[in-house]
A protein has these predicted regions:
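Extracytoplasmic beta-rich repeat domains
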Residues: 24, 39-62, 91-106, 129-146, ...
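Sec-dependent signal peptide recognition
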Residues: 2-9
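Short loop/turn segments that connect beta-strands within beta-propeller blades
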Residues: 83-86, 123-126, 163-167, 209-211, ...
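C-terminal motif of bacterial Sec signal peptides marking the signal peptidase cleavage site
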Residues: 14-15
Length: 296
């Protein structure tokens, strides 16, 4: 399964023409450059190296910010806290293990996951390691916490919920695992009364944080097509919670809005993405799998 996931991700990232139309030899014409008047001027405030990068590994380590601090990680296990205004290093911690998921932040905790399925939780104030815990498989997305629990989604489509103070497992959910999936997992949304996660099956599920009981579940997209490639409908982007509405998007499927309280579908449209949607000015924005931007 891991080999299939890795092969599929390489093909998708490289823009392989095997899946694109009837004429494999047809060259894709570059889009015409359009002159435009810039309305916003962007000035770089600072730039700081935070490690050696991901090299050739197919991972996406993203920094996260809380207040006046930015937290970042590199594949070699270096975790760095920076002043958001100046870029000055506040602390650095070296874990000496390959980090593949992160950086997550919640309630004073900085969290990362590793290629071997370890989860490390650090104190956001000084970078000291509070605890580490083992989950079922490699972690590719950022762990999330509400201060009481830490939620970790692993590449085998399982989700572990750990005690935020000790790292002990409280409960686990085993998601339906399709034969093929895009290499990646959804980040969870964690509140005081709900854990919201998307899965490779195209399902969006709301859990009770206390015991893992399912509050509701809805399928954002149904697999269609003859081949396993055509039937992939992974939710790999973090669901977006805006008030009482949840927005999410699948790969090769749909973007939609559902009720936070019931999971009832409010609307959906054809779309395809493995990134989280964004919200602004009364619209939902999706970065499409074919390098397009859609607004709904």
């Amino acid at each position: 399964m891991k080999k299939l996931n890795l092969l599929l991700c390489v093909l998708l990232v490289s823009g392989c023409s095997w899946f694109g139309g009837d004429d494999d030899d047809a060259a894709i014409e570059p889009a015409e450059l359009v002159d435009f008047q810039s309305e916003v001027s962007v000035v770089r405030q600072w730039s700081v190296s935070v490690g050696s990068g991901a090299k050739n590994y197919l991972i996406s380590l993203r920094p996260t910010a809380n207040g006046d601090t930015v937290f970042a990680a590199d594949y070699e296990g270096q975790i760095t806290a920076l002043d958001v205004g100046t870029g000055n290093v506040r602390w650095q911690t070296q874990l000496d293990v390959p980090v593949t998921g992160g950086v997550g932040y919640g309630a004073g905790l900085v969290m990362v996951g590793t290629v071997e399925g370890e989860v490390f939780t650090l104190d956001a104030d000084d970078g000291s390691v509070l605890w580490s815990s083992q989950v079922s498989s490699e972690v590719l997305s950022s762990p999330k916490s509400n201060g009481e629990i830490v939620v970790v989604h692993s590449i085998d489509n399982k989700m572990a919920v750990l005690d935020a103070k000790t790292g002990e497992e409280i409960w686990q959910h085993d998601g339906d695992a399709p034969i093929l999936s895009v290499r990646g997992t959804s980040e969870s949304v964690v509140t005081n009364n709900m854990v919201l996660s998307g899965f490779d099956s195209g399902k969006l599920i709301a859990f009770s944080p206390d015991n893992g009981s399912i509050i509701w579940e809805t399928r954002l997209a149904l697999p269609t097509g003859r081949t396993e490639l055509e039937r992939m409908v992974d939710i790999d982007g973090e669901p977006l919670l805006v008030g009482d509405v949840i927005y999410s998007v699948t790969y090769q499927g749909r973007v939609g809005a559902v009720s936070r309280g019931t999971g009832r579908s409010l609307w959906s449209q054809d779309s395809s993405s493995h990134h989280a949607p964004a919200h602004g000015d009364g619209q939902i924005y999706v970065t499409g799998a074919e390098d397009s931007v859609q607004a709904f």
